Swiss-Prot record:
Cell wall formation. It is an enzyme of class 6 (ligase). Pfam families: Dala_Dala_lig_C, Dala_Dala_lig_N. It comes from the Bacteria. The gene is ddl. Mg(2+) 2 binds at residues 314, 316. Its EC number is 6.3.2.4. Binds 2 magnesium or manganese ions per subunit. InterPro entries: ATP-grasp (IPR011761), ATP_grasp_subdomain_1 (IPR013815), D-Ala_lig_Van_CS (IPR000291), D_ala_D_ala (IPR005905), Dala_Dala_lig_C (IPR011095), Dala_Dala_lig_N (IPR011127), PreATP-grasp_dom_sf (IPR016185). This is D-alanine--D-alanine ligase. PROSITE patterns: ATP_GRASP, DALA_DALA_LIGASE_1, DALA_DALA_LIGASE_2. GO terms for biological process: cell wall organization; peptidoglycan biosynthetic process; regulation of cell shape. It catalyses: 2 D-alanine + ATP = D-alanyl-D-alanine + ADP + phosphate + H(+).
Length: 377
């Protein structure tokens, strides 16, 4: 008797600057899925945050002009309906598992995870709270600091307090090399390296177009960029380390290097570091994974200063799966193939869903028989 295939909804797109990156990741994941195990339905979130039905999404996935297909789909939809952004989910047969490949907003900030939770369906990766905390650089740093995990010093600037943070104060507290970052953006979007007052003013103005919270971080001169992949739930494992070297003259691994022209970027797989540094980075990554409550997977980025001291940069709960993405490549050199990695991620999502299903959320679990009634011994 043939075993029933798992029906997987593969979601990509979204309203972030990483929309097209998401599409490339989704293609690679689809190609890596064992079609003897999985029936795969494609769904795309448009740049407006509207979920298209399977038919329109598949057309775009297969290469038809996105703008044209989206406009045709919109004409058939009641965009003013209360559930218009997710109504397309009702047009497909029962879904067993959700596999979001949505980078940035909607996908990594806890939004779609909340949707899957409401639908009572398993999904890949971290849950609502972990996704939200890991996507917000300010919240991430607060948790890392509480857990005693080394990261760069920073100041949080908001519209309410920005007048307090002049360039002279920034230099006094953080030094004369800083990075300005929107709190909730991925793929280095809106990030500026700053070492003059003029650059600082320009960077702040740009960063505030992406978020109402902006981080100003102390910079590290001539850092080595090292990454590590994590896989698992309660007992995660770590991959071998990978390294990134940007072209001479480029200041850091920015959006251009990641997705527009990566021809000059060198990926060291594995990167050669001494055993003590490798162990310290691995230990820091696993500790951060636990502190942030991550599940399934994460890619965690590090900067190593000229003295060989590692600083945890950023965690990524839904790392890229493009042709140059390091998350799957680091697992490949660690002995886990692309298709096996996808199988494991799906199984981890199912296991976490089953574990959460054992938890109690009713009043009896709190020692209360009914609302307003307290039980006394």
């Amino acid at each position: 008797m043939t075993e029933k295939k798992l029906h997987v909804a593969l979601l990509f797109g979204g309203n972030s600057s990483e929309h097209d990156v998401s599409k490339r990741s989704a293609h690679n994941i689809y190609d890596g899925m064992d079609k003897d195990k999985y029936d795969v339905s494609i769904f795309m979130f448009t740049k407006d945050g509207i979920l298209l039905d399977n038919e329109a999404s598949q057309r775009i996935f297969d290469g038809e002009p996105e703008d044209q297909v989206v406009q045709e789909a919109y004409q058939k939809m009641d965009l003013d309906a209360p559930l218009a952004p997710i109504a397309a989910l009702s047009t497909v047969k029962e879904i067993d598992f959700f596999y979001p490949v949505i980078h940035g907003n909607l996908g990594e900030d806890g939004t779609v995870q909340g949707l899957f939770r409401l639908l009572k369906k398993p999904y890949i990766g971290s849950g609502i709270a972990s996704s939200a905390m890991s996507f917000d650089k300010d919240l991430t740093k607060r948790i890392l600091n509480q857990a005693g995990i080394r990261n760069t010093k920073y100041l949080l600037v908001t519209p309410q307090n920005k007048d307090q943070y002049s360039w002279s104060r920034i230099k006094e507290e953080l030094g004369d090399l800083v990075f300005v970052k929107p709190a909730k953006q991925g793929s280095s979007v809106g990030i500026h390296k700053v070492d003059t007052e003029e650059e600082y003013e320009t960077a702040m103005k740009d960063a505030f177009t992406y978020d109402y919270k902006v981080l100003v971080e102390a910079g590290i001169k001539n850092p080595r960029e090292i990454e590590i992949s994590i896989l698992g739930n309660e007992n995660p494992i770590a991959s071998k380390l990978g390294g990134i070297r940007v072209p001479e003259g480029d200041e850091f691994y920015d959006y251009e290097n990641k997705f527009v022209d990566a021809s000059g970027v060198v990926f060291d797989l594995p990167v050669i570091v001494d055993d003590d540094l490798a162990k310290e980075i691995t230990d820091m990554a696993l500790k951060a994974y636990e502190a942030l409550g991550m599940k399934g997977m994460a890619r965690i980025d590090f900067l190593v200063d000229e003295d060989g001291v590692p600083y945890l940069g950023e965690p990524n709960t839904l790392p890229g799966f493009t042709n140059i993405s390091l998350y799957p490549q680091m697992w490949n050199i660690s002995g886990i193939s692309y298709s096996e990695l996808i199988d494991r991620l799906i199984q981890l999502g199912i296991e976490e869903f089953e574990y959460e299903g054992q938890l109690r959320y009713d009043f009896k679990a709190l020692g209360v028989e009914k609302v307003g009634e307290k039980r006394y011994n």
